Design a protein with these regions (language model features):
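C-terminal effector modules of nucleic-acid-centric enzymes and ribosome-associated factors
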Residues: 80-388, 396-443, 452-453
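C-terminal accessory extensions/subdomains outside the catalytic/core fold
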Residues: 446-447
Length: 454
């Protein structure tokens, strides 16, 4: 029969029904390819362990082939694993696309011939080639499901299994071992519901087949949106199918289709960020802006860098300035006490030349408290009037420029520490840090105990 294009184009999944060792070949697994395709020399992921394996060879219906596609009876010759490490019920998948689960929410149909199914009932779960013990959890207030009834149910598995959305399964009772129910997986590792909250409306959307509605639900439940990998794992759709489903919504893709967001949630985050930056400007008038790292931790913890950058870039009132965020047009304006302190601090370093005092000494003589003095110092550093050479050594820019000009007159020549001290008239205390500073600027290059002036 014809293979549905959707299955053949999807992500590779092969439930293992047999694994054995063949002389001259090594480890072989067989099964019916459930979705996607697999090629010789490709890489696959063994679920639920997550182990990556290489495909040495492919057979389709007993004949060697370069590739197998969905619906075909397939045998794979695998490298780097023993047959004893594989068993029926495991699944080979496309690497990085699926995650195993210990529970799932589903739409369950109890057979009319079955006994009433009680909350907490032990059952056998069967899906693909997997069989595992499980427990039925009915959502409150239900305590029992009557024969022939249909309901949304949570199934807890004794062992992790590879599950995917829309996967069909059956349940069998423990004794006698007969089929009692069947269903469709809606969500693996389902969310926790609050006391008194009914999952019916949410699970109805997940099981509706309306993928636009499903995407809106999932993305709006996530404060920052969801990655493409998360969406694939939670819906079973390909990137192309996700793009089509999102096309009829207001949802927006970021990072070239790697992240899906809700514009309304983005706008709410922009408002929070604007308020945080405004509050920071009011509380710290001498600081240029709120640190990006601090803002991200407060507003969007866990967000990828591109998400936060997009948040700033699309805010008409904010701008990223190096490592800080500030309001557009906002400038630090010094009051008279800070202006006087700025002049004292700059004069102290300018007059010192290359024999600079310690930073605490200069700040202590600034005429303002230590906190404001440090803020004024940062303003002078950002303006380029002062230059930080190390954490504890700061020089006036004019002194550094004069020294740089002197060094550059020796371009192509070598220079040792003693020669540098003699040339600059400074002690070793300042000479070593300054030479390392010029190394970083690529004005000099260290070779052993000497420097070459580049």
């Amino acid at each position: 029969s014809a293979i549905p294009a959707k299955d053949a184009a999807g992500y590779f999944r092969l439930p293992v029904d047999r694994a054995f060792s063949m002389r001259g070949f090594g480890t072989v697994v067989t099964g019916t390819l459930a979705a996607g395709s697999v090629a010789r020399d490709g890489q696959v992921e063994l679920q639920p362990s997550g182990r990556l394996l290489r495909v040495r060879g492919v057979q389709v219906h007993g004949q060697p082939a370069e590739r197998a596609i969905a619906g075909q009876r397939t045998a794979l010759n695998l490298a780097d694993i023993e047959a004893s490490e594989l068993s029926r019920g495991m699944v080979l998948t496309e690497p990085g696309r699926f995650r195993p689960a210990r529970s799932f929410d589903c739409r369950l149909q109890l057979l009319p011939s079955a006994r009433p199914l009680r909350h907490g009932a032990p059952v056998h779960f069967h899906a693909g080639t997997a069989e595992v013990e499980a427990e039925v959890r009915l959502f409150p207030p239900a305590r029992m499901l009557r024969p022939g009834a249909e309901a949304f149910v949570r199934i807890l598995l004794r062992e992790e299994q590879m599950l995917w959305p829309r996967q069909r399964f059956i349940l069998r009772q423990f004794s006698p071992v007969i089929t009692i129910a069947g269903g469709e997986i809606l969500e693996a590792n389902g969310r926790r519901y609050r006391r008194g909250e009914s999952p019916d409306a949410r699970l109805s959307v997940l099981g509706s087949g309306d993928w636009s509605a499903v995407l809106k639900l999932l993305v709006r439940e996530a404060p920052l949106g969801l990655s493409l990998a998360d969406l694939i794992a939670r819906t079973g759709l390909t990137p192309q199918e996700l793009a089509i489903a999102s096309g009829s919504t207001k949802l927006r893709w970021l990072a070239d289709g790697e992240w899906l967001t809700d514009p309304d949630q983005m706008e709410a985050l922009r408002r929070k960020l604007l308020q945080a930056v405004s509050d920071f400007h009011s509380a710290q008038p001498l600081q240029p802006g709120l640190g990006k790292a601090d803002a991200k931790a407060a507003i969007a913890p866990g967000a990828p860098a591109f998400f936060f950058d997009e948040l700033i870039a699309t805010s008409p009132e904010l701008i990223a300035d190096g490592t800080v965020i500030r309001r557009r047009g906002r400038q630090v304006v010094l009051q008279q006490p800070e202006e006087d302190a700025s002049e004292r601090i700059e004069a102290a370093f300018r007059q010192a030349g290359l024999a600079v005092p310690t930073v605490p000494e200069v700040l202590g003589a600034s005429g303002i408290d230590a906190g404001r003095a440090r803020a004024v110092l940062q303003i002078l550093l950002r303006s380029g009037r002062l230059v930080r050479v190390t954490d504890t050594l700061i020089f006036h820019a004019a002194a550094i420029d004069r020294l740089k000009a002197t060094i550059e007159t020796r371009r192509g020549q070598s220079l040792d520490v003693a020669g540098f001290k003699e040339m600059s008239g400074i002690s070793r205390k300042y000479a070593i840090p300054l030479l390392e500073y010029f190394d970083r600027l690529k004005i000099t290059k260290r070779t052993g105990d000497r420097r070459i002036v580049i």
